């Protein structure tokens, strides 16, 4: 289970979209480096992928803690070389009215949903720029376009991740690095137009497309 390609790093790995994207990149020959906070669940996920003959390794880290996330990315680089692909999928769902949201919880959610993405991009982009290739992907959401007062942190987080992705696309496209986000404008569920496998194909389309800010966002409507 070895590959000449650099790893595809999935940050915020779990069932659903991130697993479907991971498996899609594995089919293209990328070994997987998975980052998640829950070490026990991560170990189980890696074993499931190994059972499918997919090369994968797990690295436990908190995406909302810059030092923790940076250490995990450094460990991946040391063990598997520079990443060729990254998907940032970490986010927290904390429902409740806007005015019931505390500044502390809002800040914590933003660190996971957006600041961690910046930390990851800063850690991974230099090697991609040096190589003149690479892909940075971000899981977006319809709340970026249609914010809900019952999901204030996630609405702001998805607006932030969308803005970050589009700005990075403008900055990195001239250097050969492809950046994109899939804004998932619906509820993800198996066997529906919003099935994870269908969404994964949208991420692959960005990866295989040109490094162009004009095509950096796919609004996935099923």
Per-range role (PLM):
Residues 49-67:
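Rossmann-fold cofactor-recognition segment
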Residues 14-15:
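Conserved glycine-rich cofactor-binding loop
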Residues 166, 174-222:
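C-terminal helical subdomain
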Residues 112-130:
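Amphipathic alpha-helical dimer-interface segment in Rossmann-like NAD(P)H-dependent oxidoreductases
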Residues 72, 87, 120-124:
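Hydrophobic positions on the long internal alpha-helix
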Residues 92, 99-118, 161:
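Catalytic Tyr-X3-Lys loop
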Residues 129, 135-160, 166, 173, ...:
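Catalytic loop of short-chain dehydrogenase/reductase
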């Amino acid at each position: 289970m070895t590959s000449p390609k650099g790893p595809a790093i999935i940050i915020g790995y779990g069932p659903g979209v991130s697993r479907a994207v991971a498996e899609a990149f594995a089919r293209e020959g990328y070994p997987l480096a998975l980052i998640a906070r829950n070490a026990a669940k991560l170990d189980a996920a890696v074993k499931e992928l190994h059972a499918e003959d997919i090369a994968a390794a797990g690295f436990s880290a908190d995406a909302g803690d810059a030092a923790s996330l940076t250490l995990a990315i450094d460990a991946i680089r040391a063990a598997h070389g520079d990443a060729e692909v990254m998907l940032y999928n970490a986010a927290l769902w904390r429902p409740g009215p806007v005015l019931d949201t505390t500044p502390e919880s809002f800040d914590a959610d933003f660190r996971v949903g957006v600041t961690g993405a910046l930390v990851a991009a800063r850690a991974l982009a230099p090697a991609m720029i040096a190589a003149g290739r690479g892909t940075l992907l971000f899981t977006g959401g319809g709340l970026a376009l249609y914010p809900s007062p019952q999901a204030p942190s996630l609405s702001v987080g998805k607006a932030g991740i969308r803005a970050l992705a589009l700005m990075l696309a403008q900055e990195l496209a001239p250097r050969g690095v492809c950046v994109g986000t899939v804004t998932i404008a619906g509820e993800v569920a198996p066997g529906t137009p919003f099935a994870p496998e269908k969404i994964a194909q949208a991420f692959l389309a960005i990866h295989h497309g040109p490094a162009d800010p004009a095509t950096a966002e796919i609004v996935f409507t099923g």
